Amino acid sequence: MLMLLMMILTNNKVFMETLYYYLMFNFQLMSPFGVPVPGPAPETKDIKNLYESIMNNYINILNKYTININKDNINKLKFLDNYTEEEKGYYLSGLFEGDGNIYTRCFSITFSLEDVLLANYLCTYFKIGHITAKYNFNKELTAVKWNIMKKKEQEVFMNYINGKLLTYKRYDQYFKYNFNNRLNIKLLKPKEFDLTLNPWLTGFNDADGYFYTGFQKHKNSQWLKFHLELSQKDSYILDIIKKYFKTGGILKRDYKSGATAYIYKAQSSKAMKPFIEYFNNYQPLSTRRYKQYLLLNIAYLLKLNKLHMLTNSLLMLKELMLLQSVKNMSLEMKNELNNRVKIIINKTHYNNIE
């Protein structure tokens, strides 16, 4: 079926390139001819190979349109190997405060299916925990969880994040489920710290953030827009981000359901400058956020150099946006993704058996 679709659309170059890169770089599941890629379950190096492929893909598109901008910050990769032990703790703390939880016996962090390689990377790198599947009411696979259940491994994790919590939510859960007596660790109270000096925000943004790049149109005009967005139920974390980055704004949004959300946005070249500098130093480790950030970084550099409205720049940006916008997956692709997730789950479960 996929092969037939590709044959029908061979004259649409942009679509073909988009489909090819989507299959190869977003999921690493299939060859260009629709044949499942054989091989062992992903190891730590797989996420690095994936990021290098994504980066090279973006640079190739830049070169294709002969866009002359400084590629130094687009052309480098930074992983946990490049972090100090202290920085690793800040990244884990931000991720844990964003999408983590503490239960009766378990520490857990949830990841989207697209970030299954990140979950596996962290599990393998730190050699703690295992990966499990998360299903919806229709028994469809929707996410994966990195679960840490062994006492010694929980102590390793808590030693990394101890003294690096910004909020009381995980701190309160730690005492609620009696981990203060079960683990040989005195958990320090959360405290405010300078977010610009460590990768806490990278971890938190990997969990809860969003980089947007797009065109806004009005009548016969269009202009390039990009921003960083974070949404929370209260404004505490957002206020701290605004305080230390000295930019952006916070909006309060009330919904008909009675819920309230606070939304932080930095949405101009001037507002994004400190974030560009920060994320160039502490790059996103989430596959989704990394792709979003590469696109935003390119858009930012184009606008900074007043190249963003040139014909070649517009065509290039639209191709990159199309590359990111492909969301619909065939049943075959979904099955391949599910199989990859199951391989990782089985592998980490086997490695976790004492």
From Swiss-Prot:
**Which region is the signal sequence?**
none
Extract the GO molecular function terms from the UniProt entry: endonuclease activity
One Pfam family of this chain:
LAGLIDADG_1
The answer to keyword Disulfide bond applying to this record is: no
EC assignment: the record states: 3.1.-.-
Keywords of this entry: Endonuclease, Hydrolase, Intron homing, Mitochondrion, Nuclease
> GO cellular component terms?
mitochondrion
Write down the InterPro entries for this protein, in alphabetical order. Answer: Homing_endonucl, LAGLIDADG_dom, LAGLIDADG_Endonuclease
User: Where located?
Assistant: Mitochondrion
Family the entry assigns: Belongs to the LAGLIDADG endonuclease family.
Look up the further comments and give them.
Endonuclease aI5 beta (group I intron) is encoded within an intron of the mitochondrial COX1 gene. Splicing from COX1 requires PET54, MRS1, SUV3 and MSS18. Translational initiation codon is predicted to be ATA rather than ATG.
What exactly does this protein do?
Mitochondrial DNA endonuclease involved in intron homing.
The protein, known as: Intron-encoded DNA endonuclease aI5 beta
